[in-house]
């Protein structure tokens, strides 16, 4: 009997000696009600706003409302797998996404998980998605152009690196096309691009991704998708996730371009979220902090000084209007936050003026400081010429007799509009744009019929990008601090006159009396 008790005590002592249990302390609550991607959770008394919580089946949520008895949680994942009384655990972490070069060429969802079937993202870095925007003293002046490759924008509504330029217009007026063309034009320009699709159809996003792949743009682009089929919480955080990824590259001294397509659907997602969380509605049922929703996002786009990395984030948010009404709540909010807007009109789009940019309503508040000197020189009078044309056209509709100067303004303006037409996925480099517009400024295009202006444009692009003489002229412009001097101007105009004469010579039914004459100083240049 004694030996048995000795054995038992030895076993107990041995177990006590080997006992190494760590106390697992975690705060656990339970779901009181759940629906529409929102769960009210009881028992998480110390939860913080913006904290990540975990449910079963590896589903996570974001704490958005802190009330006396419960916390409101937005669910990321399949909310149908959760039900009342399911447990919920605090993590003590805030929401973050993977960042770094590993995301280049990938398609991810709003929380940073890959959805392109190319395997996991092996990123070691993560970054919080809700951050404070850079302060005033950390920013520097926007003075470097971000080329869109679209002649109407680069000449009259220039965008600089670090700028926020709104693209606004009715549905189906080519807003996304402008943004995608801008991404494609960043090839070989050392700019990282991020395209955030908010509330878009999955088929539309698939088409855009394929186009980016076909044009080689996915080599420097990340696509973030929060589709129309996803719940409001994912659509709400998608643009912030994109900005966090861009901020990592900005801190490394890189230039980034981010497209938010579109912030109208983002505001609707936030309105849905707020109403489900029982927050008081305001104008158009949006919550009172909907202005802050977009200002905190867009203020993170900046050009920072070298102490903060020396990089930049250029933001192109897109807003969809109803019947061209830019005085609605969300459009006016975003217009007041951004540094200018590109306004697309439905009537221009249907009349064949594409991109359908309304030059009169569009503006860039950064202006010519975001242009190279050569472009500034050739495009300085362009907006005025088009304004005069639009004014004269209104008078011409009455059918009264017009004097010669009015006819000249009308003919010239019509030709300028023809030159501003540009096919989708057809970016034009800035030096070629400069040469094309020099022909407009110097009235070299006067003898050309309007139907031949696209041919003129293509010939100038070919000369400036493919022919040795044109490439040498481009190098001279770069060596001359991106400016034109009299000798460079003379070289370009000589070739422009030859191109115009060559086109005219190939036309069998050309009527010189129907067109304006070329300025006298260029008539002495020999025909080709």
Curated annotation (Swiss-Prot):
Q: What is a single Pfam family found in this protein's UniProt entry?
A: ATP-synt_ab_C
Q: Please report the record's description of how this protein sits within the membrane.
A: Peripheral membrane protein
Q: Name one GO molecular function term.
A: proton-transporting ATP synthase activity, rotational mechanism
Q: Which residues bind ATP?
A: 169-176
Q: Which reaction does this chain catalyze?
A: ATP + H2O + 4 H(+)(in) = ADP + phosphate + 5 H(+)(out)
Q: Where does this polypeptide localize?
A: Cell membrane
Top-level taxon of the source organism: Bacteria
Q: Cite a GO CC annotation.
A: proton-transporting ATP synthase complex
Q: What is its main location?
A: membrane
* Top-level enzyme category: translocase
InterPro entries assigned: ATP_synth_asu-like_sf, ATP_synth_asu_C, ATP_synth_asu_C_sf, ATP_synth_F1_a_nt-bd_dom, ATP_synth_F1_asu, ATPase_a/bsu_AS, ATPase_F1/V1/A1_a/bsu_N, ATPase_F1/V1/A1_a/bsu_N_sf
Q: For site (Required for activity), what residue positions does UniProt give? A: 362
Alphabetic keyword roster = ATP synthesis, ATP-binding, Cell membrane, CF(1), Hydrogen ion transport, Ion transport, Membrane, Nucleotide-binding, Translocase, Transport
Q: Give the enzyme's EC designation.
A: 7.1.2.2
User: What PANTHER family does the annotation carry?
Assistant: ATP SYNTHASE SUBUNIT ALPHA, MITOCHONDRIAL
Q: Can you tell me which family this protein belongs to?
A: Belongs to the ATPase alpha/beta chains family.
Give the record's subunit note: F-type ATPases have 2 components, CF(1) - the catalytic core - and CF(0) - the membrane proton channel. CF(1) has five subunits: alpha(3), beta(3), gamma(1), delta(1), epsilon(1). CF(0) has three main subunits: a(1), b(2) and c(9-12). The alpha and beta chains form an alternating ring which encloses part of the gamma chain. CF(1) is attached to CF(0) by a central stalk formed by the gamma and epsilon chains, while a peripheral stalk is formed by the delta and b chains.
Summarizing the function annotation, the protein's role is:
Produces ATP from ADP in the presence of a proton gradient across the membrane. The alpha chain is a regulatory subunit.
What's the protein here called? ATP synthase subunit alpha
